[in-house]
Amino acid sequence: MYISRNMDHWNTFIETLRTAFKEGKEQEFLTLLLTPDERDAVGLRLQIVAQLLDKNVPQREIQQNLSTSAATITRGSNMLKMMDPDFLAWVKEQVDAETQS
């Protein structure tokens, strides 16, 4: 699991993000903090995770589908190996629900 070098900063970010969502300000908050390229990268990472969780798509095919590097796919794959299976099932459920709507 990701361990920040400064957990106080990370925890402050998480709490502020939580508050932003509660108050309906998540778009503005994340737009303030992330450049357009960073927002694209987060979206790409979610697509990578979704396809990796599908388990029917080989990594090389994911790389070609998303026009990204093998290293990017590998980083996503390595993070999946470190995460709790119940959490990954929840993520898959969320991503699948978004895909259906």
Swiss-Prot record:
Give the principal location in a single coarse category: cytoplasm
UniProt keyword annotation of Cytoplasm present: yes
Q: Where in the cell is it found?
A: Cytoplasm
Binding region for DNA: 59-82
> Molecular function (GO) terms listed?
DNA-binding transcription factor activity; sequence-specific DNA binding
- In this record, what's one Pfam family? Trp_repressor
Q: Which GO terms describe its biological process?
A: negative regulation of DNA-templated transcription
User: Which keywords belong to this entry?
Assistant: Cytoplasm, DNA-binding, Repressor, Transcription, Transcription regulation
Q: Which domain of life is it from?
A: Bacteria
TM ranges are none
InterPro entries named in the record: Trp_repress (IPR000831), Trp_repress_bac (IPR013335), Trp_repressor/repl_initiator (IPR010921), TrpR-like_sf (IPR038116)
What do the Gene Ontology cellular component annotations say? cytoplasm
Tell me, what does this protein do in biology? This protein is an aporepressor. When complexed with L-tryptophan it binds the operator region of the trp operon and prevents the initiation of transcription.
Family listed: Belongs to the TrpR family.
Tell me how this protein assembles.
Homodimer.
This protein is called Trp operon repressor homolog
Gene that encodes the chain: trpR
